[in-house]
Amino acid sequence: MTPLFHLENIVRTYPDPASRDPHAVRTVLNLSELDIRAGEILGIRGHNGSGKSTLLRIIALLEPPDSGTVLFEGRPAGTDDLYLRRQVTLLLQTPYLLSRSVASNVAYGLRVRGIRNASELQNRIAASLLAVGLDPAVFLHRRRHELSGGECQRVALAARLALRPRVLLM
């Protein structure tokens, strides 16, 4: 069976800020092969700067590798493929929320994707908040500055779940 993701010979470098040579690079990811199957839960661990976040951004199709192959369901996947990018969503450790209400934060991605029907927006917002343990009656109109750090993380997760992605990276 074809894996959901197949990564092969992935290399990602960044400019080396410690070098005086303006062309010097630092390799942060050098991955020979990785298969991720549908439904699989996979943990990635490593030291700071070992490429964990870079790998997640490559899998989420937000950042291209310098070299190597990324396949999604057996077909080439790149950062320019909007359809594939919408199948995957990434929640970073320190999520960014808009300086707006919880409802606006959760609705933002839905609106970007063309969902404008008020009833559908309300249903998805409420369902995703409930899924992360936040009562919509209590949290819907709260603003970012009124939330604890953990509540901000839950709102960010609710925003991702509302999109109904096939793949959720955290």
List each model region and its residues:
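Conserved ABC transporter NBD signature motif
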Residues: G68-G78, L84, L134
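The feature captures the beta-strand-to-loop junction immediately N-terminal to the Walker
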Residues: R45-H47
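Helix-to-loop junction immediately C-terminal to a conserved catalytic motif
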Residues: A60
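Conserved catalytic motifs of ABC-family nucleotide-binding domains
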Residues: R164
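Catalytic Walker B motif of ABC-type/P-loop ATPase nucleotide-binding domains
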Residues: L168-M170
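Conserved ABC ATPase signature
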Residues: R143-L147, E151
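Hydrophobic anchor residue at the start of the ABC signature
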Residues: L157-A158
